[in-house]
Amino acid sequence: MSLQIRNDPFTQRLQQIGQWIAQGLLQPAAQALTEAQAQHPKDVRVALMGVRLAQQAGNLAGAVQAARRAVALEPGWFVAVTELALQLAAQGQFSEAMEHARHAVALAPKEPRVLHSAANVAQGAGDGKQALTWAQTALQLDPQNHPLRLDYAGMLYRERQYKQAQDEFNRVLQAQPGNEAALRNLLTCALQLGDQSEAQRLADVLIIRNPDDEQVRYWHAVAHGQTPKTQPEASVTGLFDDYAQRFDLHLVSGLKYRAPERVAQILLALRPDRRFNVLDLGCGTGLLGVYLGRLHGHLIGVDLSEKMIEQAARHGIYSRFHHVNILDALRDTPADHYEVITCLDALIYVGDLAPVIPNAFRILKAGGHFIFTCEAASEDEADLVLRPDSNRYAHKASAVERQCREAGFDEVQFEHLESLRNEGGKALPGFIVIARKPLAVPADAPAAA
């Protein structure tokens, strides 16, 4: 939120501090801000400038603390209250963030900036209905605010109101014909609405504009009825960076996701002495580590989302993390290195298993286990299916077993699940695969790609 604007010398000093923060000159900014605090200890603008400084330094807890000081100084000022709501949301403290968001809206019910910020807090908290209400009110007050309309359209899309979202994205595009975000979102709306010809038209426009963009190439292939082998890194990273703060609560409580708990049980039954090393591919927020507990070995996490890794690190169970994609981790890890490799709820984004299974076999020590989950494609579907509603891959069990055995695994067991997770209120079938590398690997075992 913006600060109150004055023209006195102290305000000019604060503006100078703000410029230093924007330029990354944090040490002189911090020193000057400390002096400003000593001179004007009750000026709320100093506290709000402290929020900016802490944000730039990557100190999220410090940003919350500074925002709390601002509210303590001016409890009835909507700018300070809104800032605290935003900073709490950034820390994943959504319950308190929503309290302050509601308070801010009550203080300034006709201020579009407040309503827009409150809507973003609600969206992060998983309260899509409230987010839409606040965003719609903000848009009624400020109908020419195109970034706000773009956010509102995105909220409609996330609530699966695809036609309404399409209408709003079109309004943005009419006002700003070059708006790339609106154009890309119109493409995904067309796909969700089953309008293949419109999706193809939009995809063709985008590919001409952005021939080297991997996300555009991906969606161009989907729009033209092809199944890309894998999803673009940027798509997966963006999804989970946005999702990280509420991932555990949403996945476990909302979607009834139990795979990490079940896989931990399987592992401890196979190796009750806990003497094994695990490579956890797509570790997310570290749910497998939570259910496994301490090992007499190393638990190494791999994830493409740095924010997910930050959440996983809080458990204090993982030995270390690698911020890379799964395929790179598999390719670059030395052979005969781990007793266990896990990959839970991640292959739905990886897609093609050809570079996955043989490399997992190579990395495992003799007698090691590769345990992974897949969403289930039926046996009358293709080996690899891209679900248009969720944009996730499903795998056919018989094809997965064939690939495991071709790679050299001698035991391949399946645990079929009627509900891998809930999706749109319905159980989504899937399976857990437990593949064992032989105790003695044949000399003619196939090489990894």
Regions found by a protein language model. Give the residues of each.
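A short acidic, Gly/Pro-enriched loop at the edge of an enzyme's catalytic core
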Residues: 331-341
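A short glycine-rich, Lys/Arg-flanked "PGG" loop and its adjoining helix->strand segment in the class I
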Residues: 354-366
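Class I SAM-dependent methyltransferase SAM/SAH-binding core
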Residues: 279, 285-330
